[in-house]
């Protein structure tokens, strides 16, 4: 009877994943987009960040409550204190046609304390090219902004019963086509774990609740202000007509390119980073199945008053995720996310465990509005792949 239920559930999970993939493809083919303008001036609000792999790559917002592998840094910094194993993990993430990112993470426990560190570097798909003589580059607004840089994260968490409190400290540097920033920020999180209506025997709890606020900090512009970048914007149709880079002022915000001179601030300018607020719930009713829910929104303390608190509602995104363990050594995961702008995100992943070794792979598809510089409208699906492995380092 149990085998029949598991097989039926497997078939239904497969059907659900197919439906999610079909839905994202349909959205990409039919959604209408608004004309897209340059995004460089918004980078001052964005902390230096690099994607990671692990379970976070496939569960995304639905991982806030769970936060139980070496990718917990993004989801909830309190996760390190409640993990049942320490981990040393490496992840490689590729954004097709966009970037590569490498991550080395460590997490461990000592008594009721959890701690960890993560080092990451990211670079455009074209390669490292960290030449100090690199000139500013202008690209069409519909293309990804080429970024390279690195970030370091230190984590500490404390467990009191089933409740843990944790924090990350982060510092990084980013070069985005000639526009350079450093950022310093912190994350704080809370996680409660316990057993509720548990029908199986396991060392891990079956109920998780998580809250977190990430990227509380600031960026500092470290590149010089560019007054005249006409020669830089050779590929920008708007700049060729000299309607923005006219030698008298920097690019206007309506320019249809991503050019470093769109940030008109002077060197040394400080700006608050966008803060992400997260809440999540996860429950494992059976030993072989877990489902999770998550909600996220973003705000910027520097612009919140002028943009009105309605932005908290407008930036809301909702996630649902599931993990299915068909065998004791294999876990499959999937998630679906949608926000108020109807942008969608679908993720799937697999994790294999062999003794003290974990191997994982995750795939994510983002469907968002884009347009070309000519004003054409449509929607674009961006694809990301993560591969990684971890060594389990003893039991908490």
From Swiss-Prot:
InterPro entries: UPF0164 (IPR005362)
Keyword vocabulary terms for this entry: Signal
Range of residues in the leader sequence: 1-28
Disulphide linkage map: none
Protein origin, superkingdom: Bacteria
Entry's family note: Belongs to the UPF0164 family.
Protein name: UPF0164 protein TP_0858
Organism of origin: Treponema pallidum (strain Nichols)
């Amino acid at each position: 009877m149990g085998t029949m239920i598991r097989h039926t559930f497997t078939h239904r999970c497969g059907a659900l994943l197919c439906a999610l993939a079909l839905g994202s493809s349909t959205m990409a083919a039919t959604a209408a987009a608004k004309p897209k303008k340059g995004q460089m001036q918004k980078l001052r609000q964005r902390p230096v960040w690099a994607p990671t792999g692990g379970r976070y790559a496939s569960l995304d917002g639905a991982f806030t409550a769970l936060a139980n592998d070496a990718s917990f840094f993004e989801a909830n910094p309190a996760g390190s204190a409640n993990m049942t194993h320490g981990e040393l993990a490496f992840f490689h993430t590729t954004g097709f046609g966009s970037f590569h990112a490498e991550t080395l993470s460590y997490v461990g426990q000592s008594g009721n304390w959890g701690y960890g560190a993560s080092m990451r570097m990211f670079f455009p798909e074209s390669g490292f090219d960290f030449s100090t003589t690199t000139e500013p580059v202008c690209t069409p607004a519909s293309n990804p902004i080429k970024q390279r840089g690195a970030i370091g994260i230190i984590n500490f968490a404390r467990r009191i019963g089933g409740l843990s409190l944790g924090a990350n400290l982060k510092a990084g540097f980013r070069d985005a086509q000639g526009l350079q920033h450093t950022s310093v920020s912190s994350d704080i999180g809370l996680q409660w774990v316990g057993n509720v209506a548990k029908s199986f025997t396991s060392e891990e709890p079956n109920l998780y609740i998580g809250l977190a606020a990430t990227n509380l900090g600031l960026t500092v512009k470290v590149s010089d202000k560019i007054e005249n970048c006409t020669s830089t914007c050779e590929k920008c149709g708007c700049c060729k007509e000299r309607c923005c880079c006219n030698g008298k002022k920097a690019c206007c915000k309506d320019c249809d390119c991503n050019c470093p001179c769109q940030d008109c601030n002077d060197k040394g300018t400080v700006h608050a980073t966008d803060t992400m607020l997260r809440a999540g719930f996860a429950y494992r009713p059976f030993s072989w199945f877990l489902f999770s829910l998550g909600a996220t929104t973003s705000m910027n303390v520097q612009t919140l008053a002028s943009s009105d608190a309605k932005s908290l509602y407008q930036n809301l995104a909702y996630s649902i995720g599931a993990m299915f363990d068909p065998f004791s050594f294999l876990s499959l995961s999937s998630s679906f996310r949608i926000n108020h702008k109807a942008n969608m995100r679908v993720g799937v992943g697999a994790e294999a465990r062999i003794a003290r070794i974990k191997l994982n792979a995750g795939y994510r598809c983002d469907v968002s509005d884009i347009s070309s510089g000519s004003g054409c409208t449509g929607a674009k699906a961006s694809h990301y792949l993560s591969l990684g492995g971890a060594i389990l380092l003893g039991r908490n």
